[in-house]
Structures are given as structure tokens and as C-alpha cells.
């Protein structure tokens, strides 16, 4: 094997914790090597060491057989190590060319920037990536997929021999992800080595050559993709086999009382009109392709998106949800798709994030908060939901994605909200945490909570939901339940002009 990267015995300690303990990793030239592990397994820390962001406390980094010690990120870049972070590092106001050459502009003899030369170089890079980029437009005006390719182009413009891709498909459509995989295969053909981090095992089996698994900061093993299967990988990741991710569905009474009734909801002017109801203890799926209207309809329910509605009732009482505050008062809560930017205050503690929706719950006198009571409530919710963190005072931006999602759920439970809208609840979390979220959602429904689930993951829709509203071009094409909830039927209604009996669904 023509090894380009060899990590040997990498150990990293932070105050009070050993983040990595004796990690070994070998990556071959022209190989796509998957790095797997649950959130908190040590993947990010290991990659930050490789990129010069953190120094290792023990161990050796070798590139092409030569030991290296990176004092900073620039040293790693100079050695040919590039990384595309899950959260982009682009300057939104600058165009793609300026982002590619930021801080290292090409200049002529008089010190003037050689704009035409940099533009030609950028055009050549994107041509090699087989992607069309408007080189004059600010990157904020580009699609998420195009921004992803600008990040990759930036790394390649630095002559990266080893490219780290951290969850690169997290915000891409299936077609965009397929294009990315084609680009990765072409880079592989040219001899570029890649470390691919993803929670989607199907992607790893599609594009990777070998897999290294970490668990709890330790090396578990390396295997060839062709010699393993999903069950074996999951067991390596979590230390146990997860035979069934989805808890069994209970049999709900068809005449269960509706807790939310929506009559004639129209999200856009002259758009389709939908009617539906959510029953007590039910998980109702909103399925459909991106842009089908499922998310905009859910946002309209909490007053976060302007919409027309003839009538809306919560537990039989007419309500008018003009804004999220009115929805909160009516007992409707949203767990947004973007936890970090919309669902949490990252720099705040677990306690403060949970308490923020219900500050009056533990108020003393008029203006003072009983901090001890808040802490007790936070501890109870952490134990109830299985939030893994040292204390209630831990900052949420230090938690894994699964634990962050549990904190968002805890916030709504602290407010006694009984109608919950989960928007892409498992995006960016590992397979073990996904199973915990699925179990938690089913436990909540068994206790009488009513849930709307929006998900692009078809197995989640099929495996969790009691009924499924399938959206297409803003219209509910069908309301499926029972044995009708199966992948082919859902996709048929989501992609074809097939109408359910009518568009008034109770």
C-alpha cells in the first residue's frame, strides 16, 4: 500500500478528559477512507490535530513517511492537507475567486493583484470539478451545493494531496450528493487521498474503499468496505448491535380525539389549500421532496410563515397563531432543522437553554429566578431524556448533536408543550443517537404528546409515523396510514401527479 498518511499512537488530553487514546490511522494515496464513530467518538478532535488546529500530546503524524509536527493550520495546508468543514469557512460577501485566493492573492511586479490570472485559475479548478459557478456573484447567492464545491476548490487550489471532507452531504439533495461522489471518484483517480466523515452508511458503502472506526476516543478497527456490512459497522461504532432502529408502532384508535385541526391552510397566494388534523398520541409524518411545501406548512402552524387559514383549533378551541409566541401560548412547539442557529443558544448552558422558554416557572418574588430550582428541573429532564453531560452548567456547544437535540426537546417539555413539530430531528447525528431519538419520540407519543415529523429520510417516515401526509408542489397528495405507509407508495405520491381520494384529510 502506497501510504500517504500514517497516524501512530495519537493521544490528546483536555482538562478532565482524555479525548483520544493511542489512535492509529493509515490512508493510502488515491484512497477514499471513511472515518466512522458516534458523536463524541473523537473524529473531530483527530481531524483538528491532523489540520494543525490542536497539537497532539503523544504520537506521530507522518506524511509520505516523513514525521511532521504542525504548529498551526497554515503548516498543515503547506504540507498538502486540506479540509472542508461541515460549517463553511467562506466569506459570504466575496465571490468564489476572492474566497479561493483569500490571503494569498497573486500579485504582479508592481504589487497589483492579477485578477484575470486568478479568475482563469478558478475557472480551471471548477471545470475540473465539473461544476458551474458564477465567479462574479457573492458566495451567499450561490446554492449550498455550489458553496460546498467552492470549499473543495479552495482546498484543491492549495495543492491538497490529502482532503478531509466532514459531513459534506449534510445539506445536499440526492442529486447534488451524487455529483459530489462523481467528483470524489475523479480526485481519487488523480491520486488525491480523502478522509470522508459521514453518518450515512449507505454513502460510505457507495464511495469509500476502507473504513476506520473510533469509539469513546479509542481505535476500534479498520476494514475494507467490500468485507463488511451495516450490522458489523454499527456494532463496531456503538459496542452493540442495533437490530431494530424503530420502536414498534402502537395501534391507535381511528376515532382518537384531534388535538390540532387545520381547515383550508394556504401557504402561498393562489396556492393549494390543505386540510388535516393531528390526533392525540399520534406521530404524523410530513413527507415530500425538498420544496414540496411540507416545511412551509409546518412553519405556518407556528406563525413563523405568513399564511391564510380558514379555521384552526387546538383541543377544540379556535386559535389564531399570528406569531410563534401565540403558538407557544397554544401549546405548539417547533424543534427546528438547524439546532445550532435556531434551536439553541450555543454559548449558554444546558440549564439556561432549557429554562429560556419558561422563565416564570421558577421565579421568586417578581424579578428573581430560583437558580437552585432551575438546576433541579434541568437535572430531572437530563436524566429523563438521557442527556450525556457533566453538569447542567455545561455549554451546549460542547455537546454532541444527539445531546443537543435532547436539550431542545427538554426545553419544550419544561414548558409543558403537548404538540411538537420535529423538523429533520436526526440530521447530523450518529446512528446510536438516532435510535435514542426514535425511542424518545415514541415514548412521548405513548404519554399523549402529539408529534408532526418532517423528514427527508424515507426510512424515518415509514418506520415512525402512524399516518403520513405526502406533499407535492404545496398540496397534500395523499394521507397514508397502516400498510399503505411504505417507500414506493410515499415516493409515488411525492413525485407523480397521483391524487388521493381528495385533499381534505382528517
Curated annotation (Swiss-Prot):
Its record classes its membrane topology as: Peripheral membrane protein
Question: Its Enzyme Commission number?
Answer: 7.5.2.7
**Any idea which GO molecular function terms this record carries?**
ABC-type D-ribose transporter activity; ATP binding; ATP hydrolysis activity
Principal subcellular localization: membrane
> Which InterPro entries does the UniProt entry name for this protein?
AAA+_ATPase, ABC_carbohydrate_import_ATPase, ABC_transporter-like_ATP-bd, ABC_transporter-like_CS, P-loop_NTPase
**Per the record's keyword annotation, is Repeat included, yes or no?**
yes
Into which family does the record put it?
Belongs to the ABC transporter superfamily. Ribose importer (TC 3.A.1.2.1) family.
Q: How does it assemble?
A: The complex is composed of an ATP-binding protein (RbsA), two transmembrane proteins (RbsC) and a solute-binding protein (RbsB).
Protein name per its UniProtKB record: Ribose import ATP-binding protein RbsA
> What is the native source organism of this protein?
Burkholderia mallei (strain ATCC 23344)
Q: Which gene encodes it?
A: rbsA
Amino acid at each position: 500500500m502506497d501510504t500517504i498518511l500514517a497516524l501512530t499512537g495519537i493521544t490528546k488530553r483536555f482538562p478532565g478528559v482524555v479525548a483520544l487514546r493511542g489512535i492509529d490511522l493509515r490512508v493510502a494515496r488515491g484512497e477514499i477512507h471513511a472515518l466512522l464513530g458516534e458523536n463524541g467518538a473523537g473524529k473531530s478532535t483527530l481531524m483538528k490535530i491532523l489540520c494543525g488546529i490542536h497539537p497532539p500530546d503523544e504520537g506521530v503524524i507522518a506524511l509520505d513517511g516523513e514525521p511532521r509536527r504542525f504548529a498551526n493550520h497554515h503548516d498543515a495546508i503547506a504540507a498538502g492537507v486540506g479540509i472542508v468543514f461541515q460549517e463553511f469557512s467562506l466569506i459570504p460577501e466575496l465571490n468564489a475567486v476572492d474566497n479561493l485566493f483569500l490571503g494569498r492573492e497573486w500579485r504582479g511586479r508592481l504589487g497589483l493583484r492579477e485578477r484575470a490570472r486568478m479568475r482563469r485559475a478558478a475557472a480551471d479548478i471548477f471545470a475540473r470539478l465539473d461544476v458551474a459557478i458564477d465567479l462574479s456573484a457573492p458566495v451567499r447567492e450561490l446554492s449550498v451545493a455550489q458553496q460546498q464545491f467552492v470549499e473543495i476548490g479552495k482546498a484543491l487550489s492549495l495543492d491538497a494531496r490529502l482532503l478531509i471532507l466532514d459531513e459534506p452531504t449534510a445539506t445536499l439533495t440526492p442529486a447534488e450528493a451524487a455529483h459530489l461522489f462523481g467528483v470524489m471518484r475523479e480526485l481519487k483517480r488523480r491520486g488525491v487521498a480523502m478522509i470522508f466523515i459521514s453518518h450515512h452508511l449507505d454513502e460510505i458503502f457507495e464511495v469509500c474503499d476502507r473504513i476506520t472506526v473510533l469509539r469513546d476516543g479509542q481505535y476500534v478497527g479498520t476494514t475494507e468496505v467490500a468485507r463488511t456490512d451495516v450490522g458489523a459497522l454499527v456494532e463496531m461504532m456503538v459496542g452493540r448491535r442495533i437490530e431494530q432502529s424503530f420502536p414498534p408502532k402502537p395501534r391507535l384508535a381511528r376515532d382518537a380525539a384531534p388535538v390540532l385541526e387545520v381547515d383550508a391552510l394556504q401557504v402561498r397566494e393562489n396556492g393549494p389549500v390543505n386540510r388535516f388534523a393531528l390526533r392525540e398520541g399520534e406521530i404524523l409524518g410530513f413527507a415530500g421532496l425538498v420544496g414540496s411545501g411540507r416545511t412551509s406548512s409546518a412553519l405556518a402552524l407556528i406563525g413563523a410563515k405568513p399564511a391564510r387559514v380558514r379555521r384552526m383549533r387546538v383541543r377544540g378551541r379556535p386559535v389564531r397563531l399570528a406569531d410563534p409566541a401565540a403558538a407557544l401560548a397554544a401549546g405548539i412547539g417547533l424543534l427546528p432543522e438547524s439546532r445550532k442557529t435556531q434551536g439553541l443558544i450555543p454559548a449558554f448552558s444546558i440549564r439556561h437553554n432549557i429554562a429560556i422558554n419558561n422563565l416564570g416557572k421558577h421565579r421568586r418574588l417578581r424579578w428573581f429566578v430560583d437558580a437552585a430550582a432551575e438546576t433541579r428541573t434541568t437535572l430531572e429532564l437530563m436524566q429523563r431524556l438521557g442527556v450525556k453531560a457533566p453538569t447542567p452548567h455545561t455549554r451546549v456547544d460542547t455537546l454532541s448533536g444527539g445531546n443537543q437535540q435532547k436539550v431542545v426537546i427538554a426545553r419544550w417539555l419544561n414548558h409543558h408543550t403537548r404538540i411538537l413539530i420535529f423538523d429533520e430531528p436526526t440530521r447530523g447525528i450518529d446512528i446510536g443517537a438516532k435510535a435514542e431519538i426514535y425511542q424518545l419520540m415514541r415514548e412521548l407519543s405513548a404519554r399523549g404528546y402529539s408529534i408532526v415529523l418532517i423528514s427527508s429520510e424515507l426510512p424515518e417516515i415509514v418506520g415512525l409515523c402512524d399516518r403520513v401526509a405526502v406533499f407535492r408542489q404545496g398540496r397534500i397528495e395523499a394521507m397514508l396510514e397502516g400498510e399503505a405507509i411504505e417507500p414506493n407508495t410515499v415516493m409515488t405520491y411525492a413525485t407523480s401527479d397521483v391524487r388521493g381520494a381528495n385533499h381534505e384529510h382528517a
